[in-house]
UniProtKB/Swiss-Prot annotation:
Glycosylation sites: 16, 242, 386
Active site, UniProt feature: 275 (proton acceptor)
Positions of disulphide bridges: none
UniProt name for this protein: Short chain dehydrogenase/reductase dpchH
Gene: dpchH
Biotechnology: Diterpenoid pyrones display various biological activities and higginsianin A shows anti-HIV activity.
Length: 401
């Protein structure tokens, strides 16, 4: 999974560098009456060149140290090494939902849950990809009964469709034991959804907030049953440390932070900042959800986690060409990357010692690690919940519940 943070050494001041580039090329942007069009063309060309230069520098300063760091971590082990998928308990009778379950970590999460007996709703936008994933799962795991794998249509970028997915699920099952908020988009250009939300924040955070909110009655009803073990697991990333330093989640505009000045919204720097901010939101969401569940005495566990630096096509796409081989040489495969999710969702010790684990951030199976200081800010967590609720209610989608 993309990290968005230099692994070592002094930080590269991208924002000041970007500003200096803008000032430098501003010399070309004040046209005279005689030759305004050529200078305007030159200014646009110079701006694109400057953005590209910053992107190359950003990739060099970020991904090479990242590869070295991950190699060291791979040699020393990820997590504390005493838990693996062989310790997943029997899950017969349980029902799970995994968003983005058709590929990557989500695919292997679905596989392991179903292999242990759970009925799994594979939540994904594309019907063809979801059904192809289910077909492949059954071919690779013939012992999984067909009825254990069900496609749940879900487009996290659309509030109306998220609510539809929740209603669809609640019409099909009377319990929900495990909700894995796994789906997400990698660093992305600055575009808006039909609801008016910035795409990265919409998919990675807002859509999952709405899905969880809509499913809370079902989760609580399951948690009220004797012997239940209900968990909500939200995938974040070490990239959360690359969040926007100026975003404190105090206004609705903070959900639409471009993380760059005009003309720079699609630079790798801005894309990375938006991604990091959305991953910060994942941790704050999980923390605040736990606080609210404790306040209500609901008995639901909420955890967030960093699955590690995972080898995916998306991870390669966000890197400069020169550093893309690092993905295939040093990153963890998605099957192994699902171990942290499975620990959080199923490990017996998490329920048996719930006070130790609930609301925490995991950095490997069985490994609690403090996230960034802002991700531990309880006030920011409450603020984020409140502005997200206001933004979602403003779309009118919740009226369909």
């Amino acid at each position: 999974m993309w990290t968005g943070q230099p692994a070592s050494g002094p930080p590269f001041d991208h924002e000041n560098h970007s500003a200096s580039c803008t000032q430098h090329f501003a010399l070309f942007s004040s046209p005279s009456p005689a030759n305004s069009e050529p200078k305007s063309m030159l200014s646009a060309w110079a701006h694109r060149l400057c953005v590209r230069a910053v992107d190359v520098l950003f990739g060099t300063f970020l991904y090479v140290p990242l590869g070295i760091l991950f190699l060291k971590k791979s040699l020393s082990g990820f997590g504390d090494g005493d838990w693996d998928s062989s310790q997943i308990p029997d899950l017969h009778g349980k029902v799970a939902v995994v968003t983005g379950g058709n590929a990557g970590i989500g695919y292997h999460t679905v596989r392991q849950l179903a292999a242990k007996g759970a009925k799994v709703y594979l939540a994904a936008r594309s019907e063809s990809r979801a059904k192809e994933a289910i077909k492949r799962l059954r071919e690779e795991n013939p012992d999984i009964p067909q009825e254990k794998l069900v496609w749940l249509p879900l487009d996290l970028s659309s509030q109306a469709q998220v609510v539809d997915a929740a209603r669809d699920l609640m019409s099909k099952t009377e319990r929900l034991d495990i909700l894995v908020n796994n789906a997400g988009v990698d660093p992305y250009n600055y575009v808006k959804t039909a609801d008016g939300f910035e795409m990265t924040m919409a998919v990675n955070h807002i859509g999952h907030w709405t899905l969880t909110y809509c499913l809370l009655p079902l989760l609580k009803a399951t948690a009220a049953q004797q012997g239940s073990d209900v968990r909500v697991i939200t995938l974040s990333s070490s990239g959360e440390r690359n969040h926007s330093a100026n975003n404190h989640f105090t206004t609705l505009k903070d959900l639409d932070d471009p993380c760059a000045g005009p003309g720079w919204e699609d630079s790798r720097l801005a894309q990375g900042k938006r991604y990091g901010t959305s991953k910060l939101a994942n941790i704050l969401f999980a923390t605040e959800l736990q606080r609210r569940m404790d306040e209500e005495g609901a008995g639901i566990l909420s955890l967030s986690l960093n699955p590690g630096t995972i080898r995916t096509e998306g991870a390669a796409d966000v890197m400069p060409l020169v550093t893309q081989p690092l993905v295939w040489l040093l990153f963890t495969d998605a099957a192994k990357g699902a171990d942290t999710t499975m620990f959080a969702a199923t490990a017996r010790e998490v329920r048996e010692n719930s006070e130790q684990w609930k609301g925490r951030y995991l950095d490997g199976p069985g490994r609690i690690k403090p996230p960034s200081p802002k991700a531990r800010d309880a006030v920011a967590a409450r603020n984020l919940w409140n502005i997200t609720a206001a933004a979602v209610k403003g779309t009118g989608a919740l009226e369909k519940l």
